[in-house]
């Protein structure tokens, strides 16, 4: 079976994708520097799958260490998750984000090219659709960004497109995903960010386990069914399967394709909160706060291309996502 290098493989989406790859019979190599993940995730991946893999603790900015991976292993394709991902922090520390995300990716591309590995699945984001496109978002819409994090995703997409133009032997999949939540049904891995969470679900989880007094709901006066922001939430296991399909695709096709991974349906903050209340069996206090600048009222994906190209579509509904999130957090109240 092909050998897949997964950068950021100990992180939330990375760890679930590693489980999917191992269960599908792939050999994997994980590279991570634990900047936003924990070593325990690697043990949990082994426990879930009963399989072993090679691991390198490496920062992508360290070209020498990075090249060592390619020197010591025959790598057939790369799934590139590694990167900083907090929107607010990117606004406060843009240079840190541009340096880490873009330079790290350039180093990776350099190493790949040097060792003749020209197949990559890149972890992009729905943020590249910017603030003005109508919904649902379709892959051929114009792209833009509103913060440094979004710009790093957009720039990396452009870099990879340019790499393909310069060398048509490359196979590149740009996966634009929406709002991943949920956790592996075993409850062994899930979202466990280092530091302040960036997403809605970890905050709801913290309220549910008593670490946070109440949930802050940013704005209830949007033009949406219940006034709160609407997003396309996708189960992380569906997302992991999407990466599996993308890897199969790049192993067999040359070219560059941007593909949405979402459910194609929007859920509001209150939808998610009430679904989670069902899962944990209690009411969770919340407080409506002013809107956050830059937040969009609603967005969700058009997912036809993923079905067409990969034969992939999301399977899990919101109640399953929140049930699996609760299962993970109740088994791991203090994280991994």
Predicted regions and their residues:
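C-terminal substrate-binding subdomain of Rossmann-fold SDR/epimerase-dehydratase oxidoreductases
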Residues: 201-336
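Short-chain dehydrogenase/reductase
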Residues: 98, 146-154, 190, 194-198, ...
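Pocket-edge positions in alpha/beta enzyme catalytic cores
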Residues: 58, 70, 97, 192-196, ...
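N-terminal Rossmann-like NAD(P)+-binding domain of SDR-like oxidoreductases, especially those catalyzing
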Residues: 1-183
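Catalytic core of nucleotidyl cyclases, primarily class III adenylyl/guanylyl cyclases
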Residues: 186-188
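Short, basic/glycine-rich phosphate-binding loops at helix/coil junctions
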Residues: 182-184, 221-222
């Amino acid at each position: 079976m092909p050998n897949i290098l997964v950068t950021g493989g100990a992180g939330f989406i990375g760890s679930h994708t590693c489980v999917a790859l191992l269960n599908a019979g792939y050999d994997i190599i994980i590279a991570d520097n634990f900047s936003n993940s924990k070593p325990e995730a690697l043990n949990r991946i082994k426990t879930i799958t009963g399989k072993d893999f090679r691991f390198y603790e490496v920062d992508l900015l360290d070209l020498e260490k990075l090249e060592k991976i390619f020197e010591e292993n025959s790598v057939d394709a790369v799934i590139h998750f590694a990167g900083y991902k907090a929107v607010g922090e990117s606004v406060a520390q843009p240079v840190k984000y541009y340096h880490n995300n873009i330079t790290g990716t350039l180093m990776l591309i350099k190493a790949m090219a040097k060792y003749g590995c020209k197949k990559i699945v890149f972890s992009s984001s729905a943020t590249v659709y910017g603030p003005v496109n109508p919904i649902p978002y379709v892959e051929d819409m114009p792209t833009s960004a509103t913060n440094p994090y979004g710009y790093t995703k957009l720039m990396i997409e452009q870099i990879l497109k340019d790499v393909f133009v310069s060398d048509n032997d490359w196979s590149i999949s740009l996966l634009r995903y929406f709002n991943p939540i949920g956790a592996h049904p075993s409850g062994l891995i899930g979202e466990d960010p280092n530091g302040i969470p960036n997403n809605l679900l970890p905050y709801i989880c913290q309220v549910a386990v008593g670490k946070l007094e109440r949930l802050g709901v940013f704005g209830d006066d949007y033009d949406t069914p219940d006034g709160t922001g609407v997003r396309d939430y996708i189960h992380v296991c569906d997302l992991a399967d999407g990466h599996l399909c993308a890897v199969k695709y790049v192993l067999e096709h040359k070219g560059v394709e941007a593909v949405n991974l979402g459910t194609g349906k929007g859920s509001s903050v209150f939808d998610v909160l009430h679904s989670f209340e069902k899962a944990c069996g209690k009411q969770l206090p919340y407080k409506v706060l002013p809107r956050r600048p830059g937040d969009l009222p609603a967005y969700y994906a058009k997912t036809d291309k993923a079905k067409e190209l990969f034969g992939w579509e999301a399977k899990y509904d919101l109640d399953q996502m929140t049930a699996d999130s609760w299962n993970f957090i109740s088994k791991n109240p203090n994280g991994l």
